[in-house]
Design a protein with these regions (language model features):
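Dynamic "connector" segments at or just before major functional cores
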Residues: 1-179, 183-204, 208-223
Length: 224
């Protein structure tokens, strides 16, 4: 049996993605600008189909003068959320991510994206009213995922620890988790998130659950 020629060039083909202006986006092994986070292109495509970041961006009031805006709320929100989905949790990570061509393409820009300080200011714009509107987006997305009214819904309330490694506001020690942490309350229906409520860890795990359940049931009954 003849031995394979290991020096022979093999055409591995390529994957073409949607263009961004004049930028051609291809998935191949011999390209020019490279990225280790090419999966963000698929994430961006799914998000555009769902319209999740579009809806979330409309929930955040922009206090800046329109004449001085370089990075819009939607592009910054996409940049931050996509980064989290890729495992880049720290704002400092965006010192490099802002120049990543795959991230830029997924977000829908062809220039350098927002810096870490700019993203930090975006996060500080959020208040309780913003959080309320963002949760409405989650519930609306959940409702829109059903073509017909479900016969039954099971809401799963889960309090879990979010460990802290600094002197954050609301930092307390939790004996069960044996660490300083927050104790956020999550509400899921299947694999879909309906609520993520940040709380300090010095409270009972069920605190606020009844009030959140009442609000969710009221909204779901309005639809079904």
């Amino acid at each position: 049996m003849p031995k394979p020629n290991c020096t022979e060039e093999v055409d591995v083909g390529m994957i073409e993605f949607a263009r961004l202006g004049r930028r051609v986006v291809e998935g191949r092994f011999d390209g020019g600008s490279m990225s280790s986070d090419a999966g963000v292109l698929l994430l961006g495509a799914v998000d555009r189909k769902l319209g999740l970041m579009d809806a979330a961006a409309r929930c955040i009031a922009d206090p800046r003068s329109p004449l001085l805006i370089k990075h819009g709320v939607r592009s910054m929100l996409c940049q931050r959320v996509y980064g989290l989905a890729l495992g880049w949790e720290d704002l400092n990570d965006h010192g490099a991510l802002r120049q990543d061509v795959a991230m830029q393409t997924a977000v829908g820009v062809d220039l350098e994206m927002a810096s870490a300080p700019t993203l930090c200011r975006l996060e500080k714009w959020a208040d309780r009213a913003t959080a309320w509107r963002l949760h409405q987006v989650l519930v609306d997305q959940f409702i829109a995922s059903f073509k017909v009214a479900p016969e039954e819904l099971v809401l799963d309330f889960d309090a879990t620890d979010n460990p802290l490694h600094g002197q954050q506001e609301g930092r307390f020690f939790h004996g069960y988790y044996d660490s300083y942490c927050y104790l956020p309350l999550y509400v899921f229906c299947g694999q879909q998130l309906l609520c993520a409520y940040l709380r300090p860890s010095r409270i009972d795990g069920a605190k606020h659950a009844a009030a959140i359940l009442k609000l969710l049931v009221r909204r779901l009954r309005q639809e079904w």
